[in-house]
């Protein structure tokens, strides 16, 4: 099963927008979200991903089929440090979960951007917490720290490591 991680072009912005609907739906179990009058989730604008040099949008494909996305920031959401890498959003379609796709994609992202990393999960998202703890522990061979935040910056665990 070939897994590709490719930087999304501006022409592929609609694919990202469409996938984000599924992502927000998945998160609706743990985040209070509501549908707009048109029956879709209200989404942020993704235009900045093609104009801000510190934002990096990626599409995930499995066997050539769109299977998810990763939005990477070169800026800490917690401190604003522009030397820290941050996975802003990470999504793999359910069909491809528990088949190594997420782990392979996360590893490729980490290997593509060297330096300090922060990975955040929402406190109520037990599946994401378990996934990221496992991926990061394997990737770093256990050399990472985890902090549990519960303030205006974030509510949930944050793993930090250097690669």
Language model features with spans:
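Conserved beta-strand-loop-alpha-helix junction that forms the acyl-donor binding cleft
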Residues: 118-133, 137, 147-154
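A short helix-loop-beta-strand connector motif used in the catalytic cores of GNAT acetyltransferases and
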Residues: 45-59
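Conserved beta-strand in the GNAT
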Residues: 59, 65-74, 86, 91
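Conserved acetyl-CoA-binding loop-helix of GNAT-fold acetyltransferases
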Residues: 92, 98-111
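A short beta-loop-alpha structural element at the N-terminal edge
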Residues: 3-18, 27
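A short, internal acetyl-CoA/4′-phosphopantetheine-binding micro-motif in the GNAT/acyltransferase core
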Residues: 87-98, 121-123
């Amino acid at each position: 099963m070939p897994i590709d991680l490719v930087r999304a072009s501006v022409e592929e912005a609609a694919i990202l927008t469409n996938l984000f609907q599924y992502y927000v739906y998945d998160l609706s179990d743990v985040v209070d979200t509501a549908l707009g009058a048109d029956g879709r989730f209200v989404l942020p604008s993704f235009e900045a991903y093609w104009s801000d040099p510190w934002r990096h949008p990626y599409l995930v494909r499995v066997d050539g089929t769109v299977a998810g996305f990763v939005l990477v920031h070169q800026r800490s959401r917690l401190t604003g440090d522009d030397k820290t890498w941050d996975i802003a959003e990470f999504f793999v379609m359910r069909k491809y979960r528990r088949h190594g796709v997420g782990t392979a994609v996360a590893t490729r992202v980490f290997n593509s951007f060297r330096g300090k990393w922060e990975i955040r999960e929402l406190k109520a998202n037990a599946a994401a917490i378990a996934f990221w703890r496992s991926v990061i522990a394997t990737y770093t061979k256990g050399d990472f720290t985890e902090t549990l935040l519960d303030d205006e910056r974030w509510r949930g665990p944050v793993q930090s490591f250097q690669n």
